[in-house]
């Protein structure tokens, strides 16, 4: 039986609106003996709230089966003084990090939110200039992810990758990306399932973050035609998925027949 990593946003829901068949698909995969881990770059809400949201959509899982980037950040940055430009809800997942306004060892950027007023607060010029000053003072730059955009019910929205790139350019330093598509993030998920990458699948809607990162680690990949999926992406993508399914609902049958 396979180890299967499942993206969340765009696979199970868009802006909280369920994509049909998600709960049933997870139940079928479990019944077939596959080991599952839910992997998300969502940095808007805490792991607890994200797990509750999935359960409300009919997807059965334990909180510990959900791997989020804030939890990964807490592990990597444990014991450090961190200036965090993140959404307030994820602070509960940053256990072991000392959050500071100045004198930071690290600057951590989180993801954007659908509510414009929160983005205006977190990614204001004042806050970005403060982060730049800390980087100039010797702090290291970390990003929960570097996504360009994400799909919402009202259309594509700019994500935090643009702000990360701006700080990288201004401070002339690369950011360490903690979420997908980083090898460390996928490695942690595979370790949790005790799986060799060659025996694992990554299922997602994001060609760059989901499929590209997984393929670079040696995993096989499946693209869903929901969420961020665009037909023209098939023509321009640098990573060719091993499979394409209409939605998460079609995954169990496809996996069962895959070579």
Label the predicted regions.
Residues 2-34, 43-259:
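Asp-based, Mg2+/Mn2+-dependent phosphohydrolase catalytic module
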């Amino acid at each position: 039986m396979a180890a299967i990593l499942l993206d969340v946003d765009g696979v199970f829901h868009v802006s909280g609106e369920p994509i049909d068949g998600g709960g049933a698909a997870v139940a079928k995969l479990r019944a077939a003996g596959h080991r599952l881990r839910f992997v998300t770059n969502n940095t808007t809400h805490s792991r607890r709230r994200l797990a509750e949201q999935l359960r409300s959509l009919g997807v059965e899982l334990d909180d510990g089966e959900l791997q989020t980037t804030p939890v990964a950040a807490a592990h990597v940055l444990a014991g450090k003084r961190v200036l965090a430009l993140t959404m307030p809800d994820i602070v509960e997942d940053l256990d072991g990090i000392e959050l500071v306004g100045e004198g930071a060892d690290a600057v951590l950027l989180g993801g954007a939110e659908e509510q414009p007023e929160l983005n205006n607060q977190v990614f204001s010029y004042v806050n970005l200039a403060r982060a730049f000053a800390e980087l100039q003072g010797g702090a290291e730059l970390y990003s929960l992810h570097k996504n360009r955009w994400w799909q919402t019910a009202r259309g594509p929205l700019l994500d935090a990758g643009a702000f990360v790139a701006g700080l990288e350019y201004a401070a002339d330093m690369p950011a360490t990306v903690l979420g997908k598509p980083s090898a460390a993030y996928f490695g942690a998920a595979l370790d949790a399932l005790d799986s060799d990458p060659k025996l694992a699948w990554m299922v997602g809607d994001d060609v760059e973050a989901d499929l590209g990162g997984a393929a670079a680690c040696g995993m096989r990949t499946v693209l869903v035609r929901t969420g961020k999926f665009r037909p023209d992406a098939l023509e321009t993508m640098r990573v060719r998925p091993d499979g394409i399914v209409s939605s998460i609902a079609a995954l169990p049958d496809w996996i069962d027949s895959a070579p």
